[in-house]
Amino acid sequence: MSRIGRKPIDIPSGVDVKIDGNVITVKGPKGTLTREIHPEMIVKIENNQIIVQRPSDERFHKALHGLTRTLIANMVEGVTKGYEKVLEVVGIGYRAQKQGKKLVLNVGYSHPVEIEEPAGITIEVPDQNRIVVKGIDKQQVGNFAANIRKVREPDPYLGKGIKYADEVLRLKEGKAGKGGKK
């Protein structure tokens, strides 16, 4: 991971980075993110770049070095561009709709499943088979999208359920019974 950790992070214009001990705050046009990093990692700002250094070449420090650099880079990208995950609802009669701050999913259960929109995340439903999750925190966006997908994971035989838009499903073959469907 040290190759990733060695790369400096450019600070774009309009982004303000503050380092207070082992707490990093990144302010940008889309919002503010704060993260506590490992106390052994050394983070400096030089020539409008964030530089992450490790105290030694131990395996633990090498792994932390790359992780810390990537987490800070994700914060900078989040406050400038933001993150989004697109999910697709596949299946006859399956649909998603937004009611106020709630996402309502009809995915084959006897009742509609309601999911509350958490703080820092926005949900868009451009049509009844697509859900767009947007936010500035990459981890929060990914976790919330995974929770939506978990409501009805894609069926391995038919592909019905909620899947990521870029996810490729490998469908299993059905039973090879006598004279069955071909």
UniProtKB/Swiss-Prot annotation:
Q: Does the keyword section mention Acyltransferase?
A: no
- UniProt feature coiled coil, ranges: none
Which Gene Ontology terms of cellular component type are present? cytosolic large ribosomal subunit
- Name the Pfam families for this protein: Ribosomal_L6 (PF00347)
The lineage's top-level taxon is Bacteria
Report the InterPro entries cross-referenced here.
Ribosomal_uL6-like (IPR000702), Ribosomal_uL6-like_a/b-dom_sf (IPR036789), Ribosomal_uL6_a/b-dom (IPR020040), Ribosomal_uL6_bac-type (IPR019906)
Q: Does the keyword Disulfide bond apply?
A: no
GO MF terms here are: rRNA binding; structural constituent of ribosome
Keywords in UniProt for this one?
Ribonucleoprotein, Ribosomal protein, RNA-binding, rRNA-binding
Q: How does it assemble?
A: Part of the 50S ribosomal subunit.
The family line of this record is:
Belongs to the universal ribosomal protein uL6 family.
| Name of the featured protein | Large ribosomal subunit protein uL6
Organism lineage reads as: Bacteria, Bacillati, Bacillota, Bacillota incertae sedis, Caldicellulosiruptorales
Q: Which gene encodes it?
A: rplF
